[in-house]
Amino acid sequence: MRKQSLVTLLMVLLSLVWLPASAERIRDLVTVQGVRDNALIGYGLVVGLDGSGDQTMQTPFTTQSLSNMLSQLGITVPPGTNMQLKNVAAVMVTAKLPAFSRAGQTIDVVVSSMGNAKSIRGGTLLMTPLKGVDNQVYALAQGNVLVGGAGAAAGGSSVQVNQLAGGRISNGATIERELPTTFGTDGIINLQLNSEDFTLAQQVSDAINRQRGFGSATAIDARTIQVLVPRGGSSQVRFLADIQNIPINVDPGDAKVIINSRTGSVVMNRNVVLDSCAVAQGNLSVVVDKQNIVSQPDTPFGGGQTVVTPNTQISVQQQGGVLQRVNASPNLNNVVRALNSLGATPIDLMSILQAMESAGCLRAKLEII
């Protein structure tokens, strides 16, 4: 009876210190190689602007594009005509062609001014062919541009909210050409992890083999898992649908601290651990005060000159420098509490974390972006 009680107590203690792995589906961890969006781009014209279009004297390509379009419609513009247009803007149109898209489907497009138009709000995009990297036309875009910004100007004053030189057209492009694909034609499909991890790649491979049979999946490297699939489109769809929903017990990832040197942001995951250390951080500030002193002659007609003499004063102040103890912190809450106790700004915290890593007190990978 006593032995059974000790075993029960030991199991309870182990459950307190064990960090459970989170269960996720394979579909949340991988992408299927070859199943991706394809970028499309085109050049077009937006018309119907209320005097906020391109200034054609400064953007000659707008006038040239309009002349070419009119000639295609059977309207000839005499050479040398100076068209003073204010309601036309040259734009670049971009879109993403989803995988397995079929002719007749519609996709969203983004319209961005490339001239000096003040706003394309309320404009209409004329028919614009969208091409892929192979210079083939895959979609045609046209429609009214929706701009999320707003602005007004009067009497030399202006106010603007958000961006007025770009907008979107929901379902503004119709797919005219289907993208050729060789997906699954050789009976092999590669699954790519969202981030490289040898352990996770082997776990995904083992999980697929347990459900679909040994040899169905093989981990090629830290990111790629090669899967043997049955031939035939419907069979492959069912096969992928089954393996995408297989649960995987994902172990906690590497301890990592991300520092954005431009914004001063510091982000860390739950696996970051701090060892005991002492930190002293001093703030050094330099103040430069410059004043111009004007010296003028006492008599207006004495022949003297007015002299401007700069008077510059520089002062240096250093604050802080008190040595503070940082206790060992085994979890994220304690890490945050320990770092906050230093009272450092985000900029100072970046230097402190770098020094902690060099001293071996920060048990995490430090990445600066």
From Swiss-Prot:
Task: List the GO terms this entry assigns under cellular component, sorted alphabetically.
Answer: bacterial-type flagellum basal body, distal rod, P ring; outer membrane-bounded periplasmic space
Cleaved signal peptide residues: 1-23
* A biological-process GO annotation: bacterial-type flagellum-dependent cell motility
**Keywords annotated in UniProt:** Bacterial flagellum, Periplasm, Signal
Q: Which GO terms describe its molecular function?
A: structural molecule activity
**Where does the record place it?**
Periplasm; Bacterial flagellum basal body
Cysteine pairings via disulfide bonds: none
**Keyword Signal in annotation:** yes
Identify the domain of life. Answer: Bacteria
What HAMAP family does the database record attribute to this sequence?
A: FlgI
Q: Which NCBIfam families match?
A: PRK05303.1
Q: What does this protein do?
A: Assembles around the rod to form the L-ring and probably protects the motor/basal body from shearing forces during rotation.
The family assignment reads: Belongs to the FlgI family.
Its quaternary organisation is: The basal body constitutes a major portion of the flagellar organelle and consists of four rings (L,P,S, and M) mounted on a central rod.
Q: Could you tell me what this protein is called? A: Flagellar P-ring protein 2
Species of origin reads: Yersinia pestis
